[in-house]
């Protein structure tokens, strides 16, 4: 694994949580832009972005919605913009790719395997749902699979990677996903040093336990030697403990309201709250935080002047 400064990624809104869970979850384009810009000002070098319907907050893959906030963020910040290709588990591959192909960003996420992606346990907490789609979407994950076949992964690598010069945040939800990434690397479809996001705590993926982080890193070391970089995200209350451990092990970190709605014991009032908290932890550990340009150099990105927005 290549050592360097710690990259802070902020996942601003995602498609996991719903508006009824927090009044601070951004879903209108102007709010997503404002939250992203504030997170960058707080120290995030990479902004991971989904889009939501401006009327009711449901996840959307509509490129027109993305284009209502992407240029605003770019004009106000030099942070790396990373667009999802995961979208949500109920979207088709073409829907999930539409915005990224239109925007040709520096980075995109790329999920490394099909899996159960259970959000339905969040139904167990009584709520006054603001919109009918919210419990319906959560319940749908009980019987659906988040599809990321070998053919899907190869198509994304070729269409976005080879076609647009986009680099990837390879999202690995379990050990087998590391072997899938190695498979595509060995076939020549993953040039350069891969940037892996170890994802912990999603129901259907690997649990958010320290032993699992050690195991994931050990397998990555075996498969990639020192030619990789890794970051960690953890869902919910395990967010800060797991990413702090990752940083101490030489990795980078991801925060944001996509992954956890909390800052300490209370609801986070903004994405920037979480960025400031992890930045303070990193600085307390005498770890240097990467600037956007340092992150670009570490990850071999094409630069913000070569995107289509």
What do the predicted segments below correspond to?
Residues 1-24, 127-133:
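N-terminal small/glycine-rich loop or linker at the start of catalytic domains
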Residues 10, 58-83, 156-159, 216-225, ...:
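Alpha-helix-loop-beta-strand connector modules within alpha/beta enzyme cores
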Residues 14-31, 85-93, 142-147, 169, ...:
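Active-site mouth loops of central-metabolism enzymes
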Residues 20, 45-67, 199-204, 261-265:
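Glycine-rich, proline-tolerant flexible connector loops at the mouths of alpha/beta enzymes
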Residues 32, 39, 50, 108, ...:
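Conserved, mostly hydrophobic/aromatic
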Residues 60-147:
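Active-site beta->alpha loop and helix N-cap motifs at the rims of alpha/beta catalytic domains
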Residues 107-256, 268:
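Catalytic alpha/beta core domains of metabolic enzymes, predominantly
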Residues 179, 218-222, 241-309:
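Structured C-terminal cap/extension of enzyme domains
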């Amino acid at each position: 694994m290549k050592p360097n400064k710690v990259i802070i990624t902020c996942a601003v809104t995602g498609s996991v949580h719903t508006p009824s869970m927090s009044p601070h979850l951004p879903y209108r384009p102007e709010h997503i832009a404002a939250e992203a810009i504030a997170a960058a000002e707080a120290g995030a070098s990479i902004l991971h972005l989904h889009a939501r319907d401006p009327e009711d907050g449901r996840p959307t893959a509509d490129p027109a919605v993305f284009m209502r906030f992407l240029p605003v963020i770019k004009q106000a910040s030099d942070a790396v913009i990373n667009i999802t290709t995961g979208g949500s588990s109920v979207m088709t591959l073409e829907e999930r790719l539409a915005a990224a192909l239109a925007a040709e960003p520096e980075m995109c996420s790329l999920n490394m395997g099909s899996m159960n992606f259970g959000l339905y346990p969040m139904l167990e907490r009584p709520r006054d749902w603001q919109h009918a789609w919210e419990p319906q979407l959560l319940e749908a994950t009980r019987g659906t699979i988040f599809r990321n076949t070998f053919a899907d992964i190869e198509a994304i690598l070729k269409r976005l990677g080879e076609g647009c010069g986009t680099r990837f945040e390879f999202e690995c939800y379990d050990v087998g996903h590391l072997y899938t990434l190695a498979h595509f690397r060995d076939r020549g479809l993953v040039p350069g040093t891969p940037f892996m996001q170890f994802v912990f705590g999603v129901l259907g993926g690997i649990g958010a336990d320290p032993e699992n982080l050690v195991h994931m890193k050990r397998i990555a070391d075996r498969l990639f030697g020192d030619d990789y970089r890794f970051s960690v995200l953890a869902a919910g209350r395990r967010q800060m403990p797991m990413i702090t451990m990752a940083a101490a092990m030489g990795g980078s970190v991801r925060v944001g309201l996509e992954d956890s709605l909390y800052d300490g014991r209370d609801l986070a009032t903004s994405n920037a709250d979480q960025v400031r908290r992890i930045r303070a932890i990193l600085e307390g550990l005498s770890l240097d935080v990467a600037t956007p340009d340092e992150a670009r150099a570490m990850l071999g990105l094409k630069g913000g002047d070569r995107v289509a927005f």
